C-alpha cells in the first residue's frame, strides 16, 4: 500500500509539477525516475531510503553522470 502511494506521488510529480520547473537534476536517470524504479524494485522502505540518499547527492557541486538503480 505504501509502495503504491509513493509511486503515485512520484508519477504525479513527473506529470504535473516537473514539466513546469527548469531541469536541475545532474544525474541520468533523473532523481524522480530513479526513485520510481528504486521503490518499484526494492519496496517503500529500502527504495525510499535509496531515493532520499540520491536526492541528497543531487546538488550543483556533485559530479553527476550516469547513476542507475543497482
UniProtKB/Swiss-Prot annotation:
Subcellular localization(s) per the UniProt record: Cell membrane
Q: Can you tell which superkingdom this protein's organism belongs to?
A: Bacteria
Bilayer disposition of the protein? Peripheral membrane protein
Q: What is the native source organism of this protein?
A: Chloroflexus aurantiacus (strain ATCC 29366 / DSM 635 / J-10-fl)
Q: Name one Pfam family in it.
A: YidD
The record's similarity note reads:
Belongs to the UPF0161 family.
Read off the InterPro entries from this record: Membr_insert_effic_factor_YidD
The record's listing under NCBIfam families reads: membrane protein insertion efficiency factor YidD (TIGR00278)
Q: Could you tell me what this protein is called? A: Putative membrane protein insertion efficiency factor
Instruction: Name the predominant localization.
Output: membrane
* Entry function: Could be involved in insertion of integral membrane proteins into the membrane.
One GO CC term of this entry? plasma membrane
Keywords recorded for this protein, A-Z: Cell membrane, Membrane
Amino acid at each position: 500500500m505504501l509502495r503504491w502511494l509513493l509511486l503515485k506521488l512520484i508519477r504525479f510529480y513527473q506529470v504535473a509539477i516537473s514539466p513546469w520547473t527548469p531541469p536541475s537534476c545532474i544525474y541520468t536517470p533523473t532523481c524522480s525516475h530513479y526513485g520510481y524504479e528504486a521503490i518499484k524494485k526494492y519496496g517503500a522502505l529500502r527504495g525510499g531510503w535509496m531515493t532520499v540518499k540520491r536526492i541528497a547527492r543531487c546538488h550543483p557541486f556533485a559530479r553527476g553522470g550516469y547513476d542507475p538503480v543497482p
